[in-house]
Amino acid sequence: MFTLKLFVYTVVIFFVSLFIFGFLSNDPRRNPGREE
């Protein structure tokens, strides 16, 4: 059970890192076509 929980936490952290990286890469301030 501990290995399964560790695997789940690893996958969650991995996807969160991808989400944060994608959000920073797609910063609205870097997109000239989007003004807010």
UniProtKB/Swiss-Prot annotation:
Cellular compartments per GO CC: photosystem II reaction center; plastid membrane; thylakoid membrane
Pfam families (UniProt xref): PsbI
GO BP of this protein: photosynthesis
InterPro entries per UniProt: PSII_PsbI (IPR003686), PSII_PsbI_sf (IPR037271)
Topological type in the membrane: Single-pass membrane protein
Location within or outside the cell: Plastid membrane
Record keywords, A-Z: Membrane, Photosynthesis, Photosystem II, Plastid, Reaction center, Transmembrane, Transmembrane helix
Domain of life: Eukaryota
Transmembrane regions: 4-24
Homology family: Belongs to the PsbI family.
Subunit structure: PSII is composed of 1 copy each of membrane proteins PsbA, PsbB, PsbC, PsbD, PsbE, PsbF, PsbH, PsbI, PsbJ, PsbK, PsbL, PsbM, PsbT, PsbX, PsbY, PsbZ, Psb30/Ycf12, at least 3 peripheral proteins of the oxygen-evolving complex and a large number of cofactors. It forms dimeric complexes.
Protein role: One of the components of the core complex of photosystem II (PSII), required for its stability and/or assembly. PSII is a light-driven water:plastoquinone oxidoreductase that uses light energy to abstract electrons from H(2)O, generating O(2) and a proton gradient subsequently used for ATP formation. It consists of a core antenna complex that captures photons, and an electron transfer chain that converts photonic excitation into a charge separation.
Protein's name in the database: Photosystem II reaction center protein I
Biological source species: Cuscuta reflexa (Southern Asian dodder)
Native organism taxonomy: Eukaryota, Viridiplantae, Streptophyta, Embryophyta, Tracheophyta
